[in-house]
Amino acid sequence: MRSESKKLECIILAAGFSSRLGEEKTLIGVGNRSLIGWVSKRISDRGVEPIVITRPDIIGEVTQSTEECRVLSNPYPERGRTGTIKIGISELDRSDSEGYRLMIVPVDRPGFSNSTLDLMMSSNKSCCPSKNGRGGHPLLLTEADINRVREAPSDAPLSSIVSPTKIEVKDPFLHLNVDTPEDLIELSKFLSFFEGNIEN
């Protein structure tokens, strides 16, 4: 049960570049918010205050978009996603001496449903949602896997460090990846679907 679980923490990854999209993906509009503001609110509405890791050149705009979230900068985002995660873990380690579970949410992979989000947040094992056998996001890590990330090189692919259990879900937009102008069309379709199925 949730009450028996270790405390849940969350890192939102927003340090990637947007060369293929042609505009800053983290800051694209989602209703009256930016994408990072919309994703972070989905997490904070469930009682978890996420840490956002972004790039130095957009940290001011990201901070303004995320209200009361802690926002940190990765000065070397080109070294890869694992290095960004390690920055967040180091920050969490300063205040969470008793250990924690960690949910990792890439800002450009927002197509998970609320039910999938709740499923990940309640898990006591390292896992990720899956559709048609292909893993998606968010990713939930246990203490043991968090420690593996701590000890790994910053440029190591996350897939070489942890092997989460895949949990099959029905989310039609689970594999949405906001990376190109064409993906913005899919993002719009997802938002329409999400607003029409807000409890799902």
In which residue ranges do the predicted regions lie?
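Conserved alpha/beta core of the MobA/IspD/sugar-nucleotide pyrophosphorylase nucleotidyltransferase superfamily
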Residues: 2-8, 147-200
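Conserved N-terminal catalytic core of the sugar/cofactor nucleotidyltransferase
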Residues: 2-3, 37-101
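N-terminal glycine-rich phosphate-binding loop and ensuing alpha1 helix
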Residues: 4-56
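Short beta-strand segments
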Residues: 13-15, 105-106, 129-130, 168-170
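Residues at secondary-structure transition points
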Residues: 22, 30-34, 57, 75-83, ...
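A residue-level structural signature of the nucleotidyltransferase/glycosyltransferase Rossmann-like core
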Residues: 51, 109, 137-140, 166, ...
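Conserved beta-loop-beta/alpha segment of the NTase-like Rossmann-fold superfamily
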Residues: 78-148
